[in-house]
Amino acid sequence: TNAMYMISSSKLKKSKKMLSDTEPYFFTLQSEMSRILRHIPDISSIYFKTNEDKDAADKKVGYIVITADKGLAGSYNHNVLKIAQEQLEKNPNHSLFVLGELGRHYFEQRGIEIEKQFHYTVQNPTLNRARNISEEIIELYRKGELDEVYIIYTSMINAIQEETQIEQLLPLKKADFNIQIPVDFKREELALKPSP
């Protein structure tokens, strides 16, 4: 058990480092989106379109479910799968995208159709894999085959506390970008390419 503890603490440290390495990019991207929306609040884009005219039962909802590849993670996988199952039952007009062996086995055993299985090991995420996954999902959204896209995953708050999250990825909500107007807003320059 001491060896298992050392291995798990090593994996936790590695995961924390990977998270801290990607957070600056994520927060900078959010900041830039906020900046763009400050200057062009009425921007129209397919990525902000909400399809409010469509009845909720007619909306095609995509769910990206992220689980582990192995089952030695306590409630980590159980809670994600439980919430995913609830969402799928609530929205029968859905498409399911699964990352992780446990998720694949769970849905296959229950006869739930998986739109796309991404056969990447979730223990070793890469930018290239993330790009491949996002390109496929975005293409379905752009074609109108998906009206909304959600991601269901477990967020590690600290070493002993985790929380299952469900977040809407598409369409983007302008309110999600904290659009605070800085003091020097009038002097702030913005160059967009291609221009809107």
Give, region by region, the residue ranges found by the protein language model:
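C-terminal beta-strand-loop-alpha-helix "lid" module of Rossmann-like NAD(P)-dependent dehydrogenases
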Residues: 1-196
